[in-house]
Amino acid sequence: MLQEIARDPVLSERLVLKGGTALNVFHLGLDRLSVDIDLNYIGALDRAVMETERPTVDAALNRLLTSQGYAVRRQPDEHAGGKWLSRYSSALGGNATLEIDVNYMARQPLFGAARMESRPLGEMRASDILVLDLHEIVAGKLVALVDRHAARDLFDARRILSIGGLDWSRIKAAVLAIGACGRRDWRTMSVDAIRGDPRELRQKLAICLPRDRFAGKGDVDAWIEETVALCRERFAFLFDLSANEREFLDGVLERGEINPDLLDVAPEIRARIGAMPMLAWKCQHVRKHRGLDT
């Protein structure tokens, strides 16, 4: 499906891959199976242009799914986008569901994107796929780690620790910007939010791993305990806010103001953070909620 998107004249330059599939299929060694497709629309930063293009993008994606034999069961109609649910015949028998999440609010890539070739899966390999920069993928994954407590996020977070050459100042700035957009107050977040559920791991993650990954009795509980401790130690700096970082969050969450110059990244990155539609929407919501627009 990713290959078909990359070949499509409408979608190839407008949709960029992010999330667990981008991380595992393009940057890691396929340590876990990740089949859902998370995409950002990046065709235009301007909202009016996006709204003009969206029907064409949605129609192209619908056409592509249908041509590949998928039966579209749900198409999102929210302003921000949402999940496409499509049924297909599984090679293991019966039907399965492919989820494609298209986000129309994350139109501003913070660190760019690049065409990449996937890791090989048997004799298959996707090529020329537009993938979000690894730093933004990692930042999004770490925000998800503390926000939704999914076993797959904990697994991915541990694997992220093995990736060399990352610029963690970039990642921290992106974590703060993305985290500020969420429903929770990022200023209250701490390492205590990093945790794992053995039952959820067995039910939802284990089936995406090699069969013998947690074969021994007590393996799951031991792995969670070790991984949570490791991630809390290594990611603690994300929650240790400087005065400027706290002021950035205060501006967004108290006054509905974006001041990216408070963040310790290059000027061009600050400009992109300042142009994030999701952050602008969050600030608009804060001002309305606090009666600051009157």
Show where each model-derived region lies.
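Active-site glycine-centered loops adjacent to acidic/histidine catalytic or metal-binding residues
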Residues: 20
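Structured mid-to-C-terminal alpha-helical surface segments
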Residues: 1-15, 25-37, 41-294
